[in-house]
Amino acid sequence: MSKALLVLEDGRVFTGMPFGAIGQTLGEAVFSTGMSGYQETLTDPSYHRQIVVATAPQIGNTGWNDQDGESRDDRIWVAGYAVRDPSPCASNWRATGTLEDELVRQRIVGIAGIDTRAVVRHLRRYGSMKAGVFSGKAMIEPLNIEALVQHVRTQQSMLGADLVGEASTLDAYVVEPKGKERFTVAALDLGIKTNTPRNFARRGIRSYVLPASATFNQIADIKPHGLFLSNGPGDPATADHVVALTREVLNAGIPLFGICFGNQILGRALGLSTYKMVFGHRGINIPVIDHATGRVAVTAQNHGFALEGEAGQSFDTPFGSAVVSHTCANDGVVEGVKLADGRAFSVQYHPEAAAGPHDAEYLFDSFVELMAAQR
């Protein structure tokens, strides 16, 4: 039986068997604790240039379908996939094929049969790090582990990686509302998931999805009732254009809502700095405290960077007073910020879920209420 290797930059090597395409891939090794929703994970643009390790032991049981993808064309965005026990068949009435067939079709190199618990414990202790998956001719014969480790180390770090332009749409497009149109939103695509415009559409909102390179004049031409900042990959410290654009929007008084990467962008626009987390938050059961109400929501998350700040912290900005509105109950990481006057707010987690709980879906309604009040 042929074998595959997961090689980490610190020299740790895990041996398994090929899963998906044969060859090599490089990326940042991260882990996701979700017990379900692997198709949504694989197609989430926020995972661009990352090798995802699944903590759930069995992956692929429900195969692959043409409904659950979170990218517009069902593109798989992960750089590689590492699993313990993949299902060789698809057991679901919606399935159009197996997970491995789709990985092969999209040329995603993966590895199976490894001790994913050991990998996760290693990443928790030492942090997310550069990695590579190698199989077939890419393993270099005779096998030279040190050469593979050196190859892994040559890739760019996620720290300082400007990836938004690679994940954003090149051309603007429109997602029409369901039923009567109530509002128009300019949605800045920093790596947007398809379920977000769907949530807007269900609330009667027409979404103009714009590339990350959009200018304020292009936004103003739409005459939107609000601006949405999406999720996305890479280091938010590199997104200076989007931060400057956000400040223009705030100066214009346009209501603003951001999620995930968009939370980091709003935070930077308000004067906060960002940092790279040790291993990040990636899962669908992460508790978040809303400090205005004391309520806890179980949330879906996918981020390796976060805003500096503390629970309930108030701070002055050029746009008025702001506050750290949400933090993670597990580790105190900032999970939301907002302007005190309420015209701009953002959260680090994913209220649109896909996959995950719907505890925070009310935030879309909060955005609708904000736009209605500013109309």
Swiss-Prot record:
It catalyses: hydrogencarbonate + L-glutamine + 2 ATP + H2O = carbamoyl phosphate + L-glutamate + 2 ADP + phosphate + 2 H(+). Coiled coil: none annotated. Pathway: Amino-acid biosynthesis; L-arginine biosynthesis; carbamoyl phosphate from bicarbonate: step 1/1; Pyrimidine metabolism; UMP biosynthesis via de novo pathway; (S)-dihydroorotate from bicarbonate: step 1/3. The keyword Ligase applies. The active site is at residues 260, 350, 352. Gene3D superfamilies: 3.40.50.880, Carbamoyl-phosphate synthase small subunit, N-terminal domain (3.50.30.20). One of its GO terms (biological process) is glutamine metabolic process. The keyword Repressor does not apply. One of its GO terms (molecular function) is carbamoyl-phosphate synthase (glutamine-hydrolyzing) activity. It comes from the Bacteria. Keywords: Amino-acid biosynthesis, Arginine biosynthesis, ATP-binding, Glutamine amidotransferase, Ligase, Nucleotide-binding, Pyrimidine biosynthesis. Small subunit of the glutamine-dependent carbamoyl phosphate synthetase (CPSase). CPSase catalyzes the formation of carbamoyl phosphate from the ammonia moiety of glutamine, carbonate, and phosphate donated by ATP, constituting the first step of 2 biosynthetic pathways, one leading to arginine and/or urea and the other to pyrimidine nucleotides. The small subunit (glutamine amidotransferase) binds and cleaves glutamine to supply the large subunit with the substrate ammonia. Composed of two chains; the small (or glutamine) chain promotes the hydrolysis of glutamine to ammonia, which is used by the large (or ammonia) chain to synthesize carbamoyl phosphate. Tetramer of heterodimers (alpha,beta)4. PANTHER family: CARBAMOYL-PHOSPHATE SYNTHASE SMALL CHAIN, MULTIFUNCTIONAL TRYPTOPHAN BIOSYNTHESIS PROTEIN-RELATED. This is Carbamoyl phosphate synthase small chain. It comes from Mycobacterium leprae (strain TN). The gene is carA.
